[in-house]
Amino acid sequence: MISDRSPSPPSSAPAVLSVSALNQAVSRMLERNFPLSWVSGEISNFTCAASGHWYFTLKDSAAQVRAVMFRGRAQYADFMPREGDKVEVRALVTLYAPRGDYQLSVEAIRRAGVGNLYEAFLQLKEKLNAEGLFDPARKRAIPSFARTIGIVTSPQAAALRDILTTLQRRAPHVRVILYPTPVQGEGSANKIAQAIATASARAECDVLLVCRGGGSIEDLWSFNHELVARTIVGCDIPVIVGVGHETDFTIADFAADLRAPTPTAAAELAATPRADWLARLEAQADDMRYVLKRQLSDTAQTLDWLSRRLISPAAYIAHERMKLQNLQARLGHATRIPLSKAQFALAQLRNRWLSQLPDTQAQRLHVINHARRMSNQINNHIASQRQSLAALSAQLEMLNPQRTLERGYAMITDEKGKIVRAPKELQPRQSVTVRLADGTAQVGIASVQETLE
């Protein structure tokens, strides 16, 4: 009899993974241990699919790795990679489960070396900003009506054609001066700075445009030089910089008095359209016409009022002469009547007095003596009253506080202006005002003694 001796699996045997589970576990491990990182290499086997996704291999001299950049990310790249391009990609390490291949899921791509350029850009920006070159208070206003516009760019640049077309459309009356210079390549930064300095020295323009079209960071690098930035700041003419596209920023943009997103926008900012100027002038003319109309109306009313009051000089003189004669007549009449009445009354009194006088010499002498006595009494009374008045005046003068002060006394008042009459009304460290004959003094109370020792 044969027995079944096949061994049973031990309870501690490891679990068996499926291929899918294994790939999922490896994918999680890769994503957990390799965060978003920059990887450099050379482009190989590049394919742009109809879906918009990019597929390529990133390699160096010893190894290679597959990479994918999906359309949502690829649309923000500023260049189309080509075979052999040296690039840097910012990517996650992922696993493509169907084949079990690990690959890079690219979030961003740039040409090799751009990272170093960007670091240099940030360092120079921080340095110049610390020196105050980018201070908004330093920036000059762009003139509203520029008669002459200078342009610093390459004569062969497409940006120049865009600028000239815009200026011709918006402000054909504006004079344009070109200061030609290379805008990329070796030595171009020095030539750009020299062109800006030339425009500043000639002082021919009301505003200066420094422009070039779009390109890679290397193409625009001439506008990230310190010399160009310092020359823009030192320029005596307001400067508008329009370099690249709206998303491109250079050191020259920060140094300029005004940054334009594109060369065309720079031309639009520099030149106000003729139609806008005509509309503004027409509005100002309407305002002036309204003001003049109001002034003329007010002046006409004033003139009409004055004309009604105005008469000929001869008539005016005759009228005033009649007024004068009338006043003279009234004055004479007013003075004659009281005088006549007074003379008549005096004559009556004299007659009455003469009629009542006794016709004797003694009575006449008595009256004369009586009149003399009365006169003397009146004079004596007046003299006595004057003496009394003088005595009262002297007494009043003696009671004048100013006289008391002139004899060496002083008057003390507290903070409220109340006169201090007793020591108990004072407190130590209290501030009082001492009034003397010729002025006042602020005095602090050191101590108070209510009785004299």
Curated annotation (Swiss-Prot):
Belongs to the XseA family. GO terms for cellular component: cytoplasm; exodeoxyribonuclease VII complex. Keywords: Cytoplasm, Exonuclease, Hydrolase, Nuclease. Heterooligomer composed of large and small subunits. GO terms for biological process: DNA catabolic process. Bidirectionally degrades single-stranded DNA into large acid-insoluble oligonucleotides, which are then degraded further into small acid-soluble oligonucleotides. It catalyses: Exonucleolytic cleavage in either 5'- to 3'- or 3'- to 5'-direction to yield nucleoside 5'-phosphates. Its main location: cytoplasm. It comes from Janthinobacterium sp. (strain Marseille). It is found in: Cytoplasm. InterPro entries: Exonuc_VII_L (IPR003753), Exonuc_VII_lsu_C (IPR020579), OB-fold_nuc-bd_dom (IPR025824). Pfam families: Exonuc_VII_L, tRNA_anti_2. Its EC number is 3.1.11.6. This is Exodeoxyribonuclease 7 large subunit. One of its GO terms (molecular function) is exodeoxyribonuclease VII activity. The keyword Hydrolase applies.
